[in-house]
């Protein structure tokens, strides 16, 4: 691992070129010719915190699959007349409390939606992605950002850029009423999970008054009163080029790709990145007691919540080591030992950073029946104090630093996991070099750094959480009793497809795995064969053992 720092900064696979298009959209390009595929993503620095408790950021992510004024319709002008009225009716619905009037408005929306569906080509965006070499199409909404991504074949880079930039120019909120049912099902599904409501309650208590206090999907009340006009304003405010990033990792030539990206993604609307006022969380005052209800008899659950740090905080690297002294993937932490020695039923530590705040917490399961919360907490504090007093060996400290560096490097070994890191780092406002430099910061950490960090964050001001057996009232979003919205043009194609078909497909020379050239094959003994390849990304060694026994499935 001594050479890891240099490998992280010099390996061709790990070079990321950062570029800005003429509209200020940021592009990160990572060439990797080890496989004939490209991972492509658009990152928007807008998430649930920018629409707290409304669910708009999440709604909007769903609607981005419904097409544009060119994709997903056979006649947008006629469709738009109906969509505009539907948007007005949703605004009226949100302002109406009378049950009879609400039912009347919802029926009008349903009638209009059924008529508008006559112009819709369902799932055309998804079909276009598949048609031009794309797989694993997906998206996700977090508190801080929204991601749109998929993997595709390199010869279709021009088509991918055209489709995915068109998607962001003028998205159309069609089939909204039927999509509401999907979101309702998501919300109800979360409510069915045993501890989900308790986690929501804790999150609200921990983060209030920050927008992180509210669920990403939004409250049930807000989900029943969506405003398409607010969704449009959300798009206009946050989906501007300067607030977005384009991530590509895979088999392409940077100099050939940049003109393609400029001619497509530079169409996205320019605009200043939105201003945000960051809400600072107040410190806990002493031992703040909180109880939550979970329908799990006999099992005791306890948590200690401290104030963590945001993603860009300089203390994060040292805090990671301090937390790993308590709990780590190798099971060698002080809390891990409590579990192994049967002093508690289970214990783990959490150190998660969002862009504006972080979660630092310990979750403990006291032993069945006779162990009290007080006794379990005393054991946990004893382990915390060991770190604060420097009661850990140099061998353990160096081992955990080495493990941290290995985790950094292993995440960069393949295209998909590397692109995931690129998306996260971009969304946090960091450069790629910032990420690579964190390995240097791990190297520079001393025992004293970790001791001081433990003293700084594991204080006597914390949230003390215990579980009570019980459940919270369940809020069910009922499935609306409307006429089904069934588009009639499932086999149709928009005029936009003709435009895509005229774009030349690049020639791709296939590469087939040749075990004689791409791997060293060594016969160790009869029926024992070693297949060996060089890790050209970093100096991590990995070994997989496959036994030729059992049925072949």
Language-model regions, residue ranges each:
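Active-site His/Glu-centered metal-binding helix of metallohydrolases
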Residues: 56-64, 322
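Short, conserved secondary-structure transition motifs
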Residues: 184-192, 280-294, 401-411
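M16 family metallopeptidases and their MPP-like homologs
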Residues: 28-30, 35-50, 56-59, 73-166, ...
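Non-catalytic, conformational "gating/processing" segments within enzyme and secreted inhibitor domains
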Residues: 173, 180-181, 195, 199, ...
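Short, glycine/charge-rich beta-strand/loop segments that flank catalytic centers
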Residues: 143-147, 177-189
């Amino acid at each position: 691992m001594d050479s890891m720092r240099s490998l992280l900064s010099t390996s061709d696979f790990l070079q990321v070129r950062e570029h800005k298009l003429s509209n200020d959209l940021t592009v990160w390009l990572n060439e990797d010719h080890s496989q004939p595929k490209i991972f492509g993503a658009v990152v928007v620095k807008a998430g649930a915190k920018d629409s707290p408790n409304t669910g708009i950021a999440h709604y909007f992510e769903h609607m981005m699959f419904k097409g544009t004024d060119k994709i997903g319709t056979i006649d947008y002008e006629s469709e738009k007349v109906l969509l505009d009225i539907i948007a007005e009716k949703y605004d009226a619905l949100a302002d109406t409390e009378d049950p009879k009037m609400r039912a009347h408005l919802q029926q009008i929306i349903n009638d209009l939606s059924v008529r508008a569906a006559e112009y819709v080509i369902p799932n055309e965006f998804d079909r276009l992605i598949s048609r031009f070499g794309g797989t694993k199409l997906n998206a996700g909404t977090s508190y801080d950002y929204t991601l749109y991504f998929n993997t595709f074949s390199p010869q279709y880079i021009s088509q991918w850029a055209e489709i995915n930039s068109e998607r962001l120019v003028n998205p159309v909120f069609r089939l909204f009423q039927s999509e509401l049912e999907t979101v309702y099902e998501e919300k109800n599904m979360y409510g069915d999970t045993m501890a989900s409501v308790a986690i929501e309650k804790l999150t609200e208590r921990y983060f209030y008054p920050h927008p992180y206090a509210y669920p990403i999907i939004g409250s049930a009340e807000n989900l029943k009163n969506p405003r398409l006009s607010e969704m449009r304003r959300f798009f206009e405010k946050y989906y501007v080029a300067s607030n977005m990033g384009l991530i590509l990792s895979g088999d392409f030539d940077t100099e050939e790709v940049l003109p393609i990206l400029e001619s497509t993604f530079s169409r996205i609307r320019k605009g200043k990145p939105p201003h945000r006022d960051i809400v600072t969380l107040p410190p806990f005052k002493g031992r703040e007691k909180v109880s939550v209800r979970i329908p799990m008899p006999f099992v005791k659950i306890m948590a200690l919540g401290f104030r963590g740090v945001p993603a860009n905080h300089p203390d994060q690297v040292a805090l990671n080591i301090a937390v790993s002294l308590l709990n780590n993937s190798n099971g060698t932490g002080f809390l891990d030992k409590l579990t192994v020695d049967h002093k508690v039923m289970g214990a783990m530590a959490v150190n998660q950073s969002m862009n504006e705040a972080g979660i630092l917490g310990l979750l403990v399961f006291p032993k069945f029946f006779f162990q009290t919360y007080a006794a379990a907490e005393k054991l946990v504090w004893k382990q915390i104090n060991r770190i604060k007093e420097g009661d850990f060996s140099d061998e353990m400290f160096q081992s955990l630093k080495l493990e941290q560096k290995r985790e950094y490097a292993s995440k960069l070994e393949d295209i998909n996991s590397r692109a995931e890191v690129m998306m996260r780092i971009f969304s946090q406002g960091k450069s790629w070099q910032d990420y690579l430099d964190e390995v240097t910061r791990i190297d520079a950490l001393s025992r004293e750094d970790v001791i001081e960090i433990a003293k700084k964050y594991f204080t006597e001001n914390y949230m003390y959480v215990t579980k009570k057996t019980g459940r919270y009232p369940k809020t069910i979003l009922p499935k609306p009793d409307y006429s089904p919205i069934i588009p009639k043009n499932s086999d149709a194609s928009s005029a936009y497809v003709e435009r895509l078909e005229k774009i030349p497909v690049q020639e791709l020379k296939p590469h087939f795995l040749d075990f004689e050239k791409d791997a060293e094959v060594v016969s160790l003994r009869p029926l024992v064969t070693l297949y060996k390849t060089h890790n050209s990304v970093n100096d991590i060694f990995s070994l997989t053992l496959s036994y030729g026994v059992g049925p072949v499935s």
